[in-house]
Amino acid sequence: MIGLTRVILRLGRNPDAGFPDGDDNYGYVIQAPLDADGRLDAALWREKKAQCTVRRFHPREAAADGWLRLRGETWYFWYDEEDEGPAEPVFKLGAHELRPGEYITVREGDGDILTFRVAEAVRI
């Protein structure tokens, strides 16, 4: 069975949200259970969910630490402290290949829907 992968997401171009060129200083670092195709592996997540972490970074906010969670078919980022914000669902995350150059959409805790680029995916 394949282990965890460190995936770094960086804010992609989001002109309607005020980021016409994206922002490499805004994103997420995820320890994710990926299969050989680069997709999330729910069975591996169940075995290693305590190690499946998320860290949100932003130039104007404190970092937020939490976990990658699965509820039904929906993957989301869950934060354990109120000041870090509510859970953030990720649109069809289970269907995406998390490989460099791919894009995913995150509904952030403030309701903004933003596109992020997979900048890095390294087995750990």
What are these regions (language model features)?
Residues 2-3, 70-73, 98-102:
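A short, compositionally biased
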Residues 1-46, 58:
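N-terminal intrinsically disordered, low-complexity, charge/repeat-rich segments that act as generic
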Residues 49-89:
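Short beta-strand/loop turn elements enriched in aromatics
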Residues 78-124:
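Short, compact, well-ordered microdomains
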Residues 6-8, 27-31, 76, 103-105, ...:
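Ordered hydrophobic segments in well-structured contexts
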Residues 10-12, 31-35, 71, 78-80, ...:
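A structural detector for beta-sheet-dominated domains
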Residues 28-32, 64-70, 116:
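Broad, structure-driven detector of short, well-ordered beta-strand segments within folded domains
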